[in-house]
Amino acid sequence: LYGNTGTHDCAPATGNPYALMSEIGTPGFGLVPDGVSEVTVTYQIAPPRTVAVNRNFFVLATTSRTAPPCGVQWLDPTGNVKGTPIGCSFLTLESPELGEYRAYVAGKLATLQAQVASLSGAIASGNLAAAKSAWLNAHLTWLEIGQDDGAYGAFGPLGGDIDGLAAGHPLGTADPGFTGLHRIEFDLWTKRNLRTAATDTVRLRQLLGQLMKAPLPTYLPATAAGIGNWLLRPHEVLEDALRDSLTADDNYGSGTDLASITADIAAVRTMLAELKPSIDPVAPHLVANASAELDSLMSAIGATRVNGAWVSVEDLPTRQREQIDADAAAAAETLAPIPDLLTSTGSNSPD
């Protein structure tokens, strides 16, 4: 597919450095092999278009479109994809947004380190109530990163050590491999043991120090796979909330699962704001719809608080719990198409 333009952003699989179509309205055209009935042209910042093939030739006339195409799929008579000779790369578009997210994560990690230091001080002072409050602040900051252990966490096993669950460890909560924020939660609420909490907080500080040693691009690389995983995260964060928090599987005594979900929502809102410029051209209503659903979820959670205190998921009336489940599921479903909308096709797709 060729056109009259000087941009070299996209090129045929042969390596010919011509753009696929003019950005100023000159028709694009191309030849296809036998058996191809239609051609779908994909764009990075506009919905795809499908045009008919006539005697192995097709024309894509556009008098007003300003988005250059960057991918082509050949379709057989049944509409199935017969081949993808050219693919779009999302690396150019999403790399700046990933950079914004990295800066956000760096700020949260710095805050988290200070909060864990405060937690350590509260434990050392023997003030259980202050230690619980400091723990909650730290835990919510971690979740606001959007990196809890199941959400395609970029921090890998280290992230699991910082905020992993006892499930999967042979000895459960007694297993030495169960470390991090939830281990300290178990110490403070279930065991009410400040001495053990102090030891486990030292370990948490070591884990955070280890995490901070490597540059963030190590964990959040601007590669096809790295960006692909990041694009999964808005949906996966809420899916984790449905699986772990709304079932109370990650409650080790604090009863703050609903507070955790508010932090998850904050993480999702941040990522949506960063991705909005890329999402809007291909799905104009997605961000607005997701934001409205997140508002409903926040309202449903807010309605559960009693005199400002958090209520455990297990203690919620059935109607309130079902409403929160439904709102979280609706938002997660709305967010699910983001990777398909923004990832690339053909030879440029993630491995």
Feature names for model-found ranges:
Residues 6, 10, 88, 235:
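Functionally engaged cysteine thiol sites
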Residues 89-351:
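Mature extracytoplasmic or organellar-lumen-exposed domains after removal of signal/transit peptides
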Residues 3-29:
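Extracellular ectodomain segments of secreted/surface proteins
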Residues 23-25, 35-88:
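Ser/Thr-rich low-complexity repeats and stalk/linker segments
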